[in-house]
Regions:
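Short amphipathic alpha-helical interaction segments
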Residues: 164-176
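Glycine-centered, phosphate/nucleic-acid-interacting loop/turn motifs that mediate DNA/RNA or nucleotide
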Residues: 181
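Core residues of bacterial helix-turn-helix
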Residues: 162-163, 187
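Short, cationic-aromatic polyanion-contact patches
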Residues: 185-210
Length: 211
């Protein structure tokens, strides 16, 4: 552990090693030592964040790497164990790590873009009168993210979400949102669903072509 700390605490600028690779090696080294009975994963991810911040010379984190790792636990442990059990070749681990870092950056950019879309949506429609049920439904659909409100909004979902008294009220509210150009209607009859009137944000039934 002392050897690891001495290496890690060397000025990042002095290391003849790419900063991102240094971060990946730091995490691998610490997790291989596994110095504590509990909490090694959390500390290892904190070391990752610290190493990347040192390389970027910024305390701001826009990459969301820890979250990306937690969402890919199976692949993470496979890559980590492969490096730990190998003959010292960490190429595959570093390849997995750098690819995951790139994916985390792309995810963060998407989340930022979605947050901007939500802000612009409410700003553009701030003068449109909405009842509390309609506003709650729109907030839930926006929070789901682009194309991720599975199945679109339906009268049944609307009633469950907003506690609308009956199907007639739900249909009336949804039709009003269509007239106000906040939602678009898809399907027909019992298969009718509603999407946000935002390009790229609509749920598309499997087998249908995106428009």
């Amino acid at each position: 552990m002392r050897v690891f700390l001495d290496w890690f605490n060397e000025p990042a600028d002095s290391a003849a090693l790419d900063g991102l690779l240094r971060a990946g090696l730091s995490h691998l080294w610490f997790e291989t030592i596994h110095p504590f009975a509990d909490g090694n994963g959390r500390i290892g991810r904190a070391i990752l964040d610290m190493a990347i911040s040192q390389d970027a010379k910024s305390a701001s984190r826009l990459h969301g790497l820890s979250i990306q790792i937690l969402t890919a636990k199976t692949e993470y442990y496979a890559a980590l164990n492969g490096a730990q059990r190998g003959a010292g070749d960490v190429t595959e681990w570093l390849a997995w790590f750098t690819n995951t870092f790139a994916e985390s950056c792309e995810t963060s950019l998407r989340l930022i873009d979605e947050a901007l879309v939500r802000t612009r949506f409410w700003s553009a429609n701030k003068d449109i009168a909405l009842n509390p049920r309609q506003r709650k439904a729109l907030i839930r659909m926006l929070a789901a993210g682009a194309g991720k409100f599975d199945g679109g909004m339906t009268p049944r979902k609307y009633m469950a979400l907003t506690k609308a008294n009956n199907r007639l009220t739900a249909n009336r509210d949804l039709s009003d949102l269509v007239e106000k150009q906040l939602l678009v209607r898809g399907g027909a009859g019992r298969s009718t669903y509603y999407n946000l009137a935002l390009p790229g944000w609509g749920w598309v039934p499997r087998g249908s072509r995106t428009t």
